């Protein structure tokens, strides 16, 4: 699975865990809702680390926590590029 899809799925998982929908997470993180929707729906070809960091702040987690999953650890480095 490519990294963009993994990021999208991870955000959706964390939203469900923390009780957020797209708009509420965007508001909490200070990110435009369209930016978050573009990441989730696969329209963003390169979700930036700064945006992911803002989302983590809105969720109250660290970047480490965001990426500390089996799926990210087993991602083929070729898929990241």
Segments (PLM) and residue ranges:
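Short, basic-rich loop-to-helix N-cap that marks the start of a DNA-contacting helix
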Residues: 43-57
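A short, Lys/Arg-rich alpha-helix, primarily the initiator
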Residues: 1-21
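Short, charged recognition helix plus adjacent turn
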Residues: 38, 67-81
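Short alpha-helical "recognition helix" segments of helix-turn-helix
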Residues: 25-26
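Recognition helix of helix-turn-helix/homeodomain-like DNA-binding domains
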Residues: 30-46
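Residue-level detection of the helix-turn-helix DNA-binding "recognition helix"
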Residues: 16, 41, 71
């Amino acid at each position: 699975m490519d990294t963009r899809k993994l990021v999208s799925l991870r955000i959706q998982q964390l939203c469900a865990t923390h009780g957020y929908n797209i708009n509420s997470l965007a508001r909490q993180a200070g990110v435009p809702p369209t930016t978050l929707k573009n990441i989730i729906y696969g329209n963003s070809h390169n979700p930036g680390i700064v945006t992911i960091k803002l989302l983590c702040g809105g969720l109250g987690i660290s970047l480490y926590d965001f990426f500390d999953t089996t799926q990210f650890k087993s991602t083929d480095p070729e898929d990241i590029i």
